């Protein structure tokens, strides 16, 4: 099973134990009509996509002790690189979606070379908002641990196939239904995308 650790705060999925200051930062981040972003032209008409609270991919557990600047940067990074509201993308198939989205969102390595892989979580803002109200995980029996899991979300993984420099990168895609599993233990807030079925 492949998992992607995610920074839960960026999704705005805050469990009851989250501190008041953390809640304040999240409220400040997610106002302004759900963060409407105008995406620049890329040989197509200018589009507007609604981008909500999003996680950033991490490789280790994340503490709640993030500064406001770090959190803002984290939120913006994930919004632009990993979140895709289905209403905002008219592309017909996953391969085109991967190729178009990586150009549109300017997904590349720092040196301008093609990124080996990237994933786009495709979900309506309504589904994302409801995750914190999702049922509790049945396997957690420790009173010090809070856990919940979402409904299934569409996750498209774009795997690099050809090209050298951005924007001439081509990707192969695999889309699967996955659930967001969220866990709060003491001062650590963690979340994972847990693989479900391939589409």
From Swiss-Prot:
GO terms for biological process: defense response to Gram-positive bacterium. Residues 1-16 form the signal peptide. Keywords: Disulfide bond, Glycoprotein, Secreted, Signal. The keyword Glycoprotein applies. InterPro entries: RNaseA (IPR001427), RNaseA-like_dom_sf (IPR036816), RNaseA_domain (IPR023412). It is found in: Secreted. Substrate binds at residues 115-119. Disulfide bonds join 98-158, 114-169. GO terms for molecular function: endonuclease activity; nucleic acid binding. The active site is at 82 (proton acceptor). GO terms for cellular component: extracellular region. Glycans are attached at residues 61, 89, 111. Pfam families: RnaseA. The keyword Disulfide bond applies. Belongs to the pancreatic ribonuclease family. This is Putative inactive ribonuclease 11.
